[in-house]
Amino acid sequence: MNWLEERMPGIGRIAKDIAEHPVPSHTLNIFYCLGGLTLLCFIIQCLTGVFLAFYYKPTPEAAFASVQMITNEVRFGSVIRSMHHWSCQLMILLVFLHMLRVYYTGAFKKPRELNWVAGCFLLVLSLGLAFTGYLLPYEQLSYWASVIGAETANTLPVIGPTLKIMMQGGIKVTAEMLSRFYVLHVMILPAITIGFLVAHFIMIRVQGISDPM
């Protein structure tokens, strides 16, 4: 730390402030850990997702075969894919439970309204990550689920038809749908999610943790 302090003055103070920052005694229970557990699941998905991206091929001809290769041939591939899958399921559950806790304890009220809004966006982004990832194995179930999702988007007022075309890559389902979902899943949505997470944690640090009801 002294070596870093000489080259980056103030970093020791920042590290000490983070490590020794006090938290209210009422937060020392599992219900106040739901947000942190959600973040842990997101980190697991990022790490396992990088591993999966080394082998996955986002084309209609090769997508399913590459997933099968990861599962059956790549060393620890089945374990990594399972970790990615189940951390996603757990993350969605934890996001809902975290928001229920925040709502029940009134932690969304003034002056934390913007943090609540950021949390709502994070919920939508989490669902978007789950939905776009579902198509990537490109099997019958995931294909038709994505078609249904595009048709559901089509029912939105004003922007629905345009959104459907953007998702499908045309009037009908095309090969572009897979590549677009892949880019959304591994680049755009994670980047936006990280941005909202940073804002979320900054607001928590500035405003502090809310008092119990």
From Swiss-Prot:
Domain of life: Bacteria
InterPro entries: Cyt_b/b6_N, Cyt_B6_PetB, Cytb/b6-like_sf, Cytochrome_b_N_euk/bac, Di-haem_cyt_TM
Residues given in the record as heme c binding sites: 33
Keywords on record: Cell membrane, Electron transport, Heme, Iron, Membrane, Metal-binding, Photosynthesis, Transmembrane, Transmembrane helix, Transport
Cofactor: binding details: Binds 2 heme b groups non-covalently with two histidine residues as axial ligands. Binds one heme group covalently by a single cysteine link with no axial amino acid ligand. This heme was named heme ci.
Cellular location(s): Cell membrane
Cofactor(s), by name: heme b; heme c
One of the Pfam families matching this protein, by short name: Cytochrome_B
UniProt: heme b 1 binding residues: 98, 200
BP term (GO), one: respiratory electron transport chain
Residue sites binding heme b 2 per the record: 84, 185
Transmembrane segments: 30-50, 88-108, 114-134, 184-204
GO molecular function, one term: metal ion binding
Keyword Lipid metabolism in annotation: no
Any single GO CC term annotated in Swiss-Prot or TrEMBL for this entry: plasma membrane
Membrane disposition: Multi-pass membrane protein
General remark: Heme 1 (or BH or b566) is high-potential and absorbs at about 566 nm, and heme 2 (or BL or b562) is low-potential and absorbs at about 562 nm.
PANTHER family, per database record: CYTOCHROME B
Similarity remark: Belongs to the cytochrome b family. PetB subfamily.
Self-association and partners: The subunits of the cytochrome bc complex are a Rieske Fe-S protein (PetC), cytochrome b6 (PetB), subunit IV (PetD), and a diheme cytochrome c (PetX).
Functional summary from the UniProt entry: Component of the cytochrome bc complex which donates electrons to the photosynthetic reaction center.
Protein name as it appears in the record: Cytochrome b6
Gene: petB
